[in-house]
């Protein structure tokens, strides 16, 4: 995710939720953290801009 991207709250929720599911199923964690809950790990990764997700918007 680049700094120039601004996500709506719905996009942010979808990104964090998708990443939390990946972490819950054993995907490697992309940041150093003491958290054990997948949703909290995903939120930390989102805040650290460590997620390799791309949002495609139709019509833009």
Swiss-Prot record:
Quaternary organization: Part of the RNA polymerase complex.
BP GO terms, sorted: transcription by RNA polymerase I; transcription by RNA polymerase II; tRNA transcription by RNA polymerase III
Subcellular location: Cytoplasm
Family under the similarity heading: Belongs to the archaeal Rpo6/eukaryotic RPB6 RNA polymerase subunit family.
An annotated Gene Ontology molecular function: DNA binding
InterPro entries: DNA-dir_RNA_polK_14-18kDa_CS, Pol_omega/Rpo6/RPB6, RPB6/omega-like_sf, Rpo6/Rpb6
HAMAP family assigned to the protein according to its UniProt record, in alphabetical order: RNApol_arch_Rpo6
Reaction(s) this enzyme catalyzes, per UniProt: RNA(n) + a ribonucleoside 5'-triphosphate = RNA(n+1) + diphosphate
GO cellular component: cytoplasm; DNA-directed RNA polymerase complex
Function noted in UniProt: DNA-dependent RNA polymerase (RNAP) catalyzes the transcription of DNA into RNA using the four ribonucleoside triphosphates as substrates.
The EC number(s) this enzyme carries: 2.7.7.6
Keywords: Cytoplasm, DNA-directed RNA polymerase, Nucleotidyltransferase, Transcription, Transferase
Main location: cytoplasm
Coiled coil: none
Enzyme's top EC category: transferase
PROSITE patterns named among the record's database cross-references: RNA_POL_K_14KD (PS01111)
Pfam families membership: RNA_pol_Rpb6
Protein name: DNA-directed RNA polymerase subunit Rpo6
